[in-house]
UniProtKB/Swiss-Prot annotation:
Lineage: Bacteria, Pseudomonadati, Pseudomonadota, Alphaproteobacteria, Hyphomicrobiales
Molecular function GO labels: DNA binding
HAMAP family named among the record's database cross-references: SfsA (MF_00095)
Pfam families found in the cross-reference section: SfsA, SfsA_N
Family classification: Belongs to the SfsA family.
Protein name: Sugar fermentation stimulation protein homolog
Signal peptide: none
Amino acid sequence: MPALRFPSRLTEGRLVRRYKRFLADVELADGRLVTAHCANPGAMLGLAAPGRPVLLSAATSPGRKLAWSWEMVEADLPGGPQWVGINTMRPNHLVAEAFREGRLPALAGVTSLRPEVRYGRASRVDFLAEHPAGPIHVEVKNCHMMRDAGLAEFPDCIAARSARHMEELAAVVRGGGRAMVIVVVQMRAGRFTVAGDVDPAFAASFRRAQEAGVATVAYRCRLDPDEVAIEAEIPMLPA
């Protein structure tokens, strides 16, 4: 499967603390203390404990305020420790790369992807996929929570914005259009489900979207310090 290679090998460190949601202090292997951007608005349950091994990417833009981004954490998950991708900006790039290489079955027949297209009630869809049978509104979700061995779950907190997206995708289908949700699981998992106990409203919206005809698919990733790769489709359990 296609891989998203980092410009340089990720840098090892240990998490000191995550704070203000989008910031993390990390002690690097050489003893330096740096502040990294945490591109994740979620609760990150079990992933933000101080002392956990983490991997950071170095900023490629010299004018960026923070020189580091937090990419992965080695978490003690059910079934054993493993690296988990926490950067919610990566899945869209992974999907786009998979499409370019023609190796993502969910997008078979798609001729082009347009990112960040406006639709619905002042929303933006992650991609508008052009297809001979008609355009497909594609929403991408990042998944990084595991509470039972092998079972990936989304969301890890109240996800009102994501619930609204589900309702708007359902409206697209009811209006004669096509829509799809691609869940990118940034860890080793064998199955995916919606965490209805975490956000019952999102779970209900997800079910309504499926019932309306929104296609849903989940892919797990392989992660290492050099790259992240979509590896395989995994079964999606009922929401």
